[in-house]
Amino acid sequence: MNADMKWLDDPEVFRVNQLDAHSDHCYYIDYADMEKSENPLMQSLNGQWEFAFSKNVMDRPENFYEENFDASSFAKIMVPGHIELAGYDKIRYINTMYPWEGKEYHRGAYSMESTGDEAGMFSEAEYNPVGSYIKRFDLSEQMREKKICICFEGVEEAMYLWLNGQFVGYAEDSFTPSEFDLTPFIREKGNVLAVQVHKMSTAAFLEDQDFFRFFGIFRNVTLKAVPEVHLEDVWLQPTLNKDNVSGRVSVKIKVTAPEGRKVAAHFVLKDRENNQVAEDNITLEEKDGSRVGVIDTEVGSVKAWDNHCPYLYHAYVELRSEDGEILEIIPYDIGFRRLEMIDKVIYLNGKRLVITGVNRHEWSAKTGRSISMDEMTADIDCMIRNNINAVRTCHYPDQIPWYYLCDKAGIYVMAETNMESHGTFQKLGAIEPSCSVPCSIPQWREAVVDRARSNFETFKNHTAILFWSLGNESYAGDDIEAMNTYFKEKQDGRFVHYESSFYDRNYEETISDVESRMYAKPYEVEEYLNNNPKKPYILCEYMHDMGNSMGGLGTYMKLIDKYEMYHGGFIWDFIDQALLVKDEVTGKEVLRYGGDFDDKPSDYEFSGNGIVFADRKEKPAMQEVRYYYGLYR
């Protein structure tokens, strides 16, 4: 198969040769390797890559992936990182408009009778920048003679991949991992990996989030050596029983192994002090070319997990040979909790759930959405310090470590799928859905369901996730309904959230378990709750913290005591989106917001809505948050 630039124009092509999404577990050959700082089965490709920038598809170095290609004219670029912050293209912040507004007329393929398939919209566009990356590497000794996969944790927005001159695959969805099998093309030494990243494709219609419009390889790139016997996927479902003192855990695994090879699977659960509290053998059966196993194990005495006491247990799945030799170990920390809705009120472990939350973009003043572990840890510490107990991952899945940090800290998560098509149905503030995407357009359905699938499969084991969110501000329709159906069929005990059913009440019963609103005034919340409400109420965005804001927070907080069905909400938002740059006059570093980069179209200072500045210093508004949220601590 050869790469086809026309895939950029086709909403029905969003992944080619990409491996199926699976749980975000780590795996090790034995317990000794598990204690090492670096996993010998992993090899990072982060660092310096060769790079060339082109203004569009026609100007790209077409054969740059060939092994004998002369890349002497290529520059150097650091991965992970945004291409714009390396000095290429234009830094641009936009809220709801698309980058082409006012310059080119685009409507989503099949969104209107007159549009058709929109062939050439992006593949032949005068402006659609391309980044061509080359990475040369040798396999580490521990990785050799094994199946090798590569994982791109985040590439914005569409990527083509080659290895040693051979086409490997294509992927969209900027914010979930894209994995490919490199085994047919890889060698021990002298590998040439080539990645071509396109700033816009049909995925652009689904990624109209309120943020700076960057592109490039902005998250980690890792080679993974896959053992001959390998746990491909694990789904751990711990549940706190009704008595609040005992629990059970369901374990579902998918294992790959050579035909005829006998493999045993064993589950072990230990507490914080490393005392074993449960164990069970997992019987494996052949299914669709893999081996699958399921157990449901009772645990006699457990400590419940919640925001006040985020107690985690150490779970292990061991794969062993016929004679008992350990072949692979998968560790995962899990917590026991019970989430339920009784009489339209949500309860966690038998207590009414109160959300004192915040929306959080991933952001660094120096590196944009390519953030560090230290910055993530600082955000968790800030939330705990200021009585914030929940986070909405607006409006895309975050880096994998963020979910582990939330598990450990007891921060409740509304895990949002990477989808926002705001600019297709709201124009200059008016709701006008005549060309809304994805809506009920069949050609877009599988693309958005795949985004839901990637979100679920990757993060399904995280105790902190209480809600799956279908996305943000993408109107309503059969395609959104199909996403909801996907989550519901999983029956994982979590609730599904979506706000934009508010715009089309025909779908309010089929695309959200909660009544969700943005910026509804307190009296509007009361109007809903006083008039035969159908669902519990959550403000997925409120208290827009732009400028000297947050003064009315106390009025909203009073509703928590007044109405059982009101569960609180998520402040907009956690951190300003601004970049540290050197001032041309003073030479000092200053924070610059949307519009400060001569970017047009732009929504200017609207990028600054945080309760912390972009350098993570707390704003005065945080005093209000700490006080009022603290009343419900």
What does each model-found stretch correspond to?
Residues 161-163, 246-284, 293:
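Beta-strand-rich binding/interaction modules
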Residues 232-240, 247-250, 328, 382-385, ...:
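Active-site region of glycoside hydrolase catalytic domains
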